[in-house]
């Protein structure tokens, strides 16, 4: 695993075995392959698999799963984020929120890119997914969460809140979990303090999703680009 996710597997596995619901988001869905197969696949129905999954920044217009209770009350979701895709899923994964990456909505390719990711262009991707485990308990994973500002997008926040309630084994209210429009001050509460280097998080705007698309690189082009950047730093 990574420095963030590298221990506590047995403790969490024991909780899941007791029927505990579990939601993991963004970097938390990226364990090592061994832990991903042994724990994440049965826990939440999928994981970011090194050498297979990718982590570009792109504009996703996320569509919730029609008629599923997690979709209740969910409005428009249009956000730019480091939405991982080409996730390694369990065969019984439920696609709770999906979007399609392509050449027009790519902001830029990040550090992890692969042939599988390159070939996923134009294919619908479950960015939010869930699983119903044997015995009836549930788990879910979400690849978004890099840009904190996106929590101020009502539909985005609503979908995740609904999913948390669903994963806990509760019925999602007909109009969705009760929530309200977030202010900029609220968006900045309880964040780490980096002193003078702390940046205030701004509310999302149309400018955040307006950009000239980046290049959908082949794996070789990506390797060459990264090598060029390294040479420039020397």
Locations of the language-model features?
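Residue-level detector of secondary-structure boundary/capping sites
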Residues: 3, 61, 151-155
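Short linear interaction motif-like sites in intrinsically disordered regions of transcription factors
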Residues: 10, 41-44, 59, 114, ...
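Short, flexible coil/turn micro-motifs enriched in small/turn-prone residues
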Residues: 14-16, 40, 140, 164
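Hydrophobic/aromatic-lined pockets within catalytic cores
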Residues: 17-21, 45-48, 164-172
């Amino acid at each position: 695993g990574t420095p963030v996710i590298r221990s506590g597997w047995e403790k969490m596995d024991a909780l899941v075995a007791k029927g505990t619901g579990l939601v993991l988001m963004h970097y938390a869905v990226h364990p090592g392959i061994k832990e991903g197969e042994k724990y994440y696949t049965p826990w939440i129905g999928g994981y970011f698999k090194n050498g297979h999954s990718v982590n570009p920044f792109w504009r996703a217009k996320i569509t919730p799963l029609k008629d599923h209770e997690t979709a209740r009350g969910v409005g428009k979701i249009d956000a730019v984020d480091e939405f991982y895709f080409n996730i390694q899923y369990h065969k019984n994964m439920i696609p709770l929120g999906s979007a399609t990456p392509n050449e027009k909505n790519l902001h830029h390719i990040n550090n992890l890119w692969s042939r599988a990711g390159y070939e996923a262009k134009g294919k619908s991707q479950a960015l939010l997914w869930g699983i119903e485990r044997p015995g009836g308990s549930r788990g879910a994973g979400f690849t978004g969460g890099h840009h904190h500002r996106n929590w101020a997008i009502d539909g985005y926040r609503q979908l995740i809140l609904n999913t948390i309630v669903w994963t806990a084994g509760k019925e999602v209210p007909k109009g969705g979990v009760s929530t309200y429009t977030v202010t900029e001050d609220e968006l900045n509460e309880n964040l780490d303090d980096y002193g003078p280097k702390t940046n205030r998080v701004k509310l999302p705007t149309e400018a955040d999703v307006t950009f000239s698309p980046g290049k959908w690189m082949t794996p070789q082009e990506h390797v060459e680009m990264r090598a060029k950047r390294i040479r420039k730093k020397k």
